[in-house]
UniProtKB/Swiss-Prot annotation:
The keyword Cytoplasm applies. The lineage of its organism: Eukaryota, Metazoa, Chordata, Craniata, Vertebrata. The keyword Membrane does not apply. GO terms for cellular component: cytoplasm; cytoskeleton; focal adhesion. This is Cas scaffolding protein family member 4. One of its GO terms (biological process) is positive regulation of phosphatidylinositol 3-kinase/protein kinase B signal transduction. It is found in: Cytoplasm, Cytoskeleton; Cell junction, Focal adhesion. Residues 380-390 have a biased composition (Polar residues). It comes from the Eukaryota. Pfam families: CAS_C, Serine_rich, SH3_9. Its main location: cytoplasm. Residues 11-73 form the SH3 domain.
Length: 804
């Protein structure tokens, strides 16, 4: 709309559209935004070439001409009405009346402007050639700016869609075509038929009257909001004039339709107004023909009502209930030709149905849920149900479907988390053995890995891949590779058990070391498995393995040999970690062994009864594995009892008191302990110490005495740090000498037990020395260091007396 002059002969006002935003740099410049319509007041501004004087929203100023586009007037332009009229006044003109052009279809040929409101609006009487103006609150005002000479703005009032009245001129209005459902009978309706849309109160009366007396076919009606928008008619190029159903209103209000007529009369079928491809779903009954004839003959308005988005169909007695995969989309079930599709409410979720196929492959949790709900599958309460959905239950089913989808996803995630958690728990193994047995196991498995790798490397030479050499040794190489794989697997199982035991430690540094070394061994074992698997698949074929020249890249056999060459070093490093930290790793095992032994002592029968039971027992001969496991448990108990002699001393007076109170026990010797005390062992047999061991014991005692004297004399940290290092070094040499010289198993267990305790005291001494140096001259730190020195000296002398 352009702001032109309203008087004939007046100069035309030029309008321009802003192409870009403009910000005023001075007071004379006019600021505007892109898309604004400016009124050009003067194009030739003196001393301002390229600038126009323009007007925008009552503000006048200079605007750059290169940012404006002049709007040219076209012949189709018409002047705006001068003054707004009231709703009751008529506007007469000698010429043709003002008409609103329709974008979809040409305007009607009649002399009167007939606007379409909502669906159809009746025209004004033919004799009164007036332009109907609605009330000002519901009108849309379009304001056109005028020049400064016309300060008042002209208002053009356009009508908004209002509720239509009954038509009086059928030949001069749009006719609304009947919605096509594929029935030939509906095509015989009158071409010019008008539909009135009743209000919500009228609709309630219509539904009640329909359900009580009349046999009227239900056709779609919808509760439109007053003042709501509408979709235009379908394009006139279509061969069949089918009125398009408003999409937004259909989705919003389709659930508000009453279901009274559906539940009362099951004999009459509703014409589904929302689906145009409902093939074969509803047959044309005789009632429909009568109803259509009644529509054409009766002067009454035809009544139409929408069915709900889900047609309630009677369920079979043995029909299976399936949850549709796309139940959230409105009217999906009407487009589906399969019967018996029901949504499952939330409350029935605990009862089993035939689960949909899309749900069966979601996750393992879905299968577990299915198996858990198989018992009440054929419940008569479900199979005998005949449901008629109400709008409330329909909305509830949609809400329950959302919650059901979220519940299924959460159940699957929970079950996957629990399964992964259980698998991780199963993978973590802990070794319940004493320190000595763990060290022996680690050393023996390490020797096995080293010997098997050495046996394989015996065949590796400069010419071992030649045909003659490989043909001779191929079977031996294969057996050696099997031994390497088996030995590494056994050590890896033991290492994983140590890693599980290390999870109970508080030393994060030790846990990280064990975890990293275990990961290295696991990677090497996986490489061995992959290479050996490839060799087994080719059956160790000579044609594949024989080569007479140097290879640039490693094949499977070379990769296996290279990995077997480095595995013993990784295994040795892990074994050293276990030996050095065995007391920390398996300390809790000894404590549990002490508690188990304490319980055994309380309930152990006399020795004679035990011997007689063993003689009469038919299970005297046990497998070798059970015997070895029992022997390992006894060794653990022995070591733990040696480490806790005070537990023995506490148990002796208890047994003596019981024997004194009960005279029947006087003729019976008390049950012997599992192992005698170290002093008792010394009376029977002494361990012969070598010359080197004796020298190291003497050096240790001397270093400890010098260290203690320096502490008592108040020497500076530079002095007692050196003496502390000397004590620790001599102690480590002593432990290494004792462990290497002792070969017998019983003596070795005893020496390893005392040596591990000695190593622990040496570690405590190192920590106390570090603390004393940092806090020097703190008396508390020095006193703690002196107490550690005294403990070390006491245990060393006791250990020496125990051995010899």
């Amino acid at each position: 709309m352009r702001g032109t002059s309203i008087r004939e002969g007046a100069p035309k006002t030029l309008l321009a559209r802003a192409l870009y935003d403009n910000h005023a740099d001075c007071s004379d410049e006019l600021a505007f935004s892109r898309g604004d319509i400016l009124t050009i007041v003067e194009q030739n501004v003196p001393e301002s070439e390229g600038w126009w004087r323009c007007l925008l929203h009552g503000r006048q100023g200079l605007a750059p001409a290169n940012r404006l586009q002049v709007l040219r007037e076209t012949p189709a332009d018409r002047p705006c009405p001068l003054l707004p009229r009231g709703p009751d006044t008529d506007l007469t003109s000698s010429g043709a009346p003002y008409q609103v052009q329709d974008l979809i279809s040409p305007p009607p040929q009649g002399p009167v402007y007939e606007p379409m409101r909502s669906w159809v609006e009746g025209p004004s009487p033919a004799t009164a050639q007036v332009y109907e103006l609605p009330e000002s609150p519901s009108s849309a005002r379009i304001i056109c700016e005028k020049t400064l000479s016309f300060p008042k703005q002209a208002l053009s009032v356009l009508p908004r869609p209002t509720r239509a009245s009954l038509p009086t001129l059928p030949s001069q209005v749009y006719d609304v075509p009947v919605q096509r459902q594929g029935f030939s009978t509906l095509e015989r309706l009158e071409k010019q038929q008008f539909y009135d849309i009743p209000t919500s109160s009228q609709k309630a009366l219509l539904h009640s009257s329909t359900s009580q007396g009349r046999d009227v076919t239900l056709a779609p009606t919808m509760a439109f909001r007053q003042g709501g928008g509408y979709n235009p008619l379908s394009s006139p190029q279509k061969s069949e004039r089918i009125h398009d159903t408003p999409v937004l209103l259909e989705k919003a209000d389709v659930r508000n339709v009453s279901m009274t007529s559906f539940t009362k009369d099951s004999g009459s079928r509703a014409i589904p107004g929302s689906s145009a491809v409902h093939t074969g779903a509803v047959a044309l009954s005789p009632q429909l023909g009568n109803t259509v004839q009644r529509k054409n003959s009766l002067p009454e308005e035809p009544t139409y009502a929408f069915p709900t988005s889900r047609d309630p169909l009677p369920s079979d007695a043995g029909g299976s209930y399936k949850v549709p995969s796309r139940f959230l989309i409105p009217r999906v079930e009407q487009q589906n030709t399969m019967p018996n599709i029901y949504d499952t409410p939330k409350a029935m979720q605990g009862v089993s149905h035939n689960a949909p196929k899309a749900m069966q492959g979601v996750s393992l949790a879905g299968k577990e849920l299915e198996r858990g709900r198989e018992a009440p599958e054929n419940s008569p309460w479900i199979s005998g149900q005949t449901s008629f959905l109400s709008p409330d239950s329909d909305r509830l089913s949609v809400a329950s479907s959302d919650s059901r989808a979220s519940v299924v996803s959460s159940c699957s995630s929970i079950s996957m988390d629990s399964s992964s958690g259980s698998s991780s728990e199963d993978s973590v193994k802990e070794l319940w053995m004493d320190v000595d047995f763990a060290k022996e196991t680690a050393v023996s498995l390490q020797h096995k890995v080293a010997s098997s790798a050495a046996g394989l490397l015996l065949f590796v030479s400069r010419t071992w891949r030649f045909k003659d050499s490989l043909e001779t040794n191929i079977h031996r190489i294969r057996r050696a590779a099997d031994h390497v794989e088996e030995s590494v697997r056994e050590f890896l199982d033991f290492a994983q058990g140590v890693g599980g035991t290390a999870c109970n430690l508080t030393d994060s540094y030790l846990q990280a070391r064990i975890r990293d070394q275990l990961q290295t061994i696991s990677s090497s074992y996986q490489t061995l498995l992959d290479a050996k698997g490839s060799l087994d698949r080719c059956n160790w074929s000579l044609e594949v393995l024989v080569t007479d020249k140097v290879q640039n890249s490693l094949d499977d056999l070379e990769r296996f040999v290279a990995t077997a060459r480095i595995v013993p070093e990784d295994v040795k490093r892990f074994t050293s970690i276990v030996i050095a930290n065995g007391k920390l790793l398996f300390k809790q095992n000894c404590e549990k062994g002490e508690m188990d032994l304490k319980c055994e002592r309380c309930i152990r029968p006399p020795q004679r009864e035990t011997e007689s039971y063993q003689e009469s027992s038919p299970f005297d001969r046990q497998p070798t594995t059970e015997h070895s496991f029992e022997l390992a448990r006894k060794n653990r108990v022995n070591v733990c009892w040696q480490q806790s002699p005070n537990l023995q001393e506490k148990g002796k007076p208890t047994m003596e008191g019981k024997s004194n109170r009960n005279p029947d026990f006087h003729g019976m010797s008390p049950p012997p302990l599992t192992s005698p005390s170290p002093s008792g062992q010394n009376t029977e047999r002494k361990i012969h110490l070598s010359k080197h061991s004796r020298l190291y014991f003497g050096a240790l005692f001397k270093a400890i005495s010098v260290f203690a004297s320096s502490l008592s004399n108040g020497q500076p940290p530079e002095v007692f740090i050196t003496q502390s290092k000397l004590v620790i070094t001599v102690g480590q040499k002593l432990v290494d000498t004792l462990c290497s010289e002792t070969q017998e198993k019983d003596e070795r267990n005893e020496i390893l037990c005392g040596s591990s305790h000695l190593c622990g005291l040496l570690k405590d001494l190192a920590l106390a020395t570090k603390s004393a140096v940092i806090q020097y001259p703190s008396p508390s730190a020095l006193s703690l260091l002196q107490s550690e020195v005294e403990r070390l000296e006491h245990h060393s002398r006791k250990f020496r007396d125990t051995l010899e």
